[in-house]
């Protein structure tokens, strides 16, 4: 029994050691430094949200680092209309390596979502996720249109103080089909009103001519 207990303790100790590999350690001559290798979007022009941001960071130091921060989205004079979190899970970047962090802005109207059928995500013939527009009229005030600027602000600890990392990217949301439909509706309305006014004016002039 003592041998069994000792073996269990040894197993637990080995397992515990494996879990603690990335715990912070005071390394002599430790260098903590992070650079932005890329701050980009999956595209620059959108008809509707979502917009997915990719932040690629490079750890140029010799110890692992877990930077965190936010992306602040502005639209003209409207500041911070959305705030997205980066690296919420506190994922580490290993020394001399890159790591990508993604964050998605989907707070719009309408918005593309994954098509779900029978509780499963629908894929097309090429294995890509099929998406469809979700029209939640309670979010009608969140119709996005125009130029947007995303400003990234991350922070990491260099061992002495918090070091900021910044980046900026711009993109456009143009719901062109909604604009086209609205234009056509307005055009028909204008033609209808114009025809009605012309008809009324013609009848009035004819009536005046008879009298």
Language-model-detected regions and their locations in the chain:
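Surface-exposed, gly/pro-biased binding rims or lids
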Residues: 4-39, 176
């Amino acid at each position: 029994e003592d041998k069994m207990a000792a073996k269990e303790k040894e197993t637990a100790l080995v397992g515990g050691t494996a879990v603690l590999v990335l715990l912070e350690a005071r390394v002599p001559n430790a260098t903590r430094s992070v650079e932005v290798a890329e701050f980009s979007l999956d595209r620059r022009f959108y008809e509707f949200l979502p917009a997915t941001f990719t932040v690629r960071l490079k750890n140029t130091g010799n110890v692992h680092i877990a930077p965190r921060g936010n992306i602040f989205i502005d639209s003209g004079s409207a500041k911070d209309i959305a705030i997205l979190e980066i690296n919420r899970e506190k994922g580490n970047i290993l020394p001399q390596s890159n790591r990508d962090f993604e964050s998605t802005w989907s707070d719009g109207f309408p918005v593309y979502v994954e098509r779900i059928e029978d509780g499963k995500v629908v894929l097309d013939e090429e294995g890509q996720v099929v998406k469809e527009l979700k029209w939640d009229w309670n979010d009608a005030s969140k119709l996005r249109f125009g130029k947007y600027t995303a400003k990234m602000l991350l922070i990491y600890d260099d061992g002495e103080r918090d070091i900021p990392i910044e980046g900026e990217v711009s993109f456009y949301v143009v719901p062109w089909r909604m604009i086209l439909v609205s234009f056509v509706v307005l055009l028909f309305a204008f033609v209808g009103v114009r025809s009605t006014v012309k008809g009324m004016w013609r009848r009035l002039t004819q009536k005046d001519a008879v009298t």
